[in-house]
């Protein structure tokens, strides 16, 4: 099989391009995939060649239902070295915002799937670009949320500032989406205000606290309920072991 038949229907998607990369859709052996490659002006520069290789190494082992999966890293005629990913053709959140097509289903996925994907990235200590509407895709067929630009380097840990910036950027993106769909949900608006507070100390401490707030629950109330449950369990055990407990009826 020649390279011409291996790769067919290669089409540039300029709306999906990133700072250093061009994005294409194509068929590989007849199956639709996405292609990420360096822009022409960077393809022969060793620094940028190393950058795309590092991104492939960082992302290859990531596995999450709301993160685009990487399949391969190979040379493609006229495009050079490329990262090949699953086909995630659909609309970016930016396009939906611009066209005022954001609905409550999109908002619901941002409350759950998006936060879960962010948590997965943080747990794996992946340094990543700022979250933005251009990096969030709702797939064409079933509308699943997918992150398409999730990281370029794995580190021993992420800094406190990086974690806080994630929460800030999430608030900005959620706020734009709420504005686009005309949603005035008081809980979500409160979350946006706290995420984007100019003082990082006033933002949510972590994604777990953010998730609880999105569900309309506070972490403090959660811990109070846990404490009450534990106290009741201690009382029950003490009663069961007490010599004054009534003897069972035979």
Question: Predicted segment positions?
Answer:
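Conserved short submotifs of the Hanks-type protein kinase catalytic core
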Residues: 77-92
């Amino acid at each position: 099989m020649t390279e011409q038949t291996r790769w067919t229907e290669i089409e540039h998607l300029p709306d999906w391009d990133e700072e250093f990369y061009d994005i294409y859709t194509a068929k590989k052996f007849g199956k639709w995939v996405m292609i990420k490659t360096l822009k022409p002006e960077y393809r022969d520069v060793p620094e940028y060649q190393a950058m795309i290789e590092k991104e492939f190494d960082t992302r290859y082992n990531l596995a999450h239902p709301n993160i685009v999966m990487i399949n391969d890293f190979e040379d493609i005629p006229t495009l050079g070295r490329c990262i090949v990913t699953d086909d995630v053709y659909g609309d970016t959140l930016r396009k939906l915002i611009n066209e005022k097509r954001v609905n409550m289903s999109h908002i619901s996925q941002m409350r759950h799937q998006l936060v879960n994907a962010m948590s997965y990235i943080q747990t794996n200590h992946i340094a990543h670009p700022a979250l933005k509407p251009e990096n969030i895709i709702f797939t064409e067929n079933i509308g699943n949320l997918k992150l398409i630009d999730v990281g370029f380097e794995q580190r021993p840990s992420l800094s406190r500032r990086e974690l806080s910036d994630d929460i800030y950027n999430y608030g900005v993106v959620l706020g734009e989406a709420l504005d686009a769909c005309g949603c005035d949900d008081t809980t979500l608006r409160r979350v946006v205000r706290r995420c984007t507070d100019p003082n990082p100390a006033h933002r949510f401490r972590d994604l777990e606290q953010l998730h609880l707030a999105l569900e309309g629950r506070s972490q403090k109330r959660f811990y109070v309920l846990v404490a009450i449950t534990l106290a009741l369990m201690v009382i029950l055990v003490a009663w069961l072991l007490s010599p004054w407990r009534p003897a069972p009826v035979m």
